[in-house]
Amino acid sequence: STSQLRFQSSDKKDDFRMVLPDIHPGPFHPIGGSNITALIYKKMDSTAMVMHSISNHDLNLPTQKEVQNYLNSLQESKVQQGGAVCTEPVAVTINKARAGGLLFDRTALLFLSLSPHGMEDLPPNVRSEIEQFAENRNFEQVLIVDTHNAMGKEISKEDSDDLLLAAKSTLDTLKTKQSHPFKFGFANSEDMKLIEN
């Protein structure tokens, strides 16, 4: 499945999505879904920011047929919840682990990182444990971004445990925060007519 946060202006002229596919780019260029991020971006009319969810290479789409089936399934997605409020961001650091989050109505958006230390894909148990924790605290949904912003080794048990603690602390703090109306903006460099040198 694929999770999305959809932002739409009140006049419905501006539409933007944050997309967290439950698949993994790969296995390698140009095979299968190696460029799945770009394909999702194009499928959504270049108005999407595609994030790396908690997934690993077991979730690669190995053939172009599977990639096309997946892309076609995006058209069938429905908006499950609406709202126009969010909290201020919350950030929690435990040792090398960092979690940042926002709460949109009852949907939490979490960003997990060990940056500037490197890391490989987050293990699936991190996702399932955070999702269970969020469900127990009456969140509608939790979307988890593996920021994957520094390449490195497989995540150690200690770092994984710290990421879980940071994520849970972030969720607990978000529950105490006041929500506010917000505005969003989105720019696409394709519309800027940039000149390459």
Task: Tell what function each PLM region has.
Residues 1-197:
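Terminal domain-initiation and capping elements
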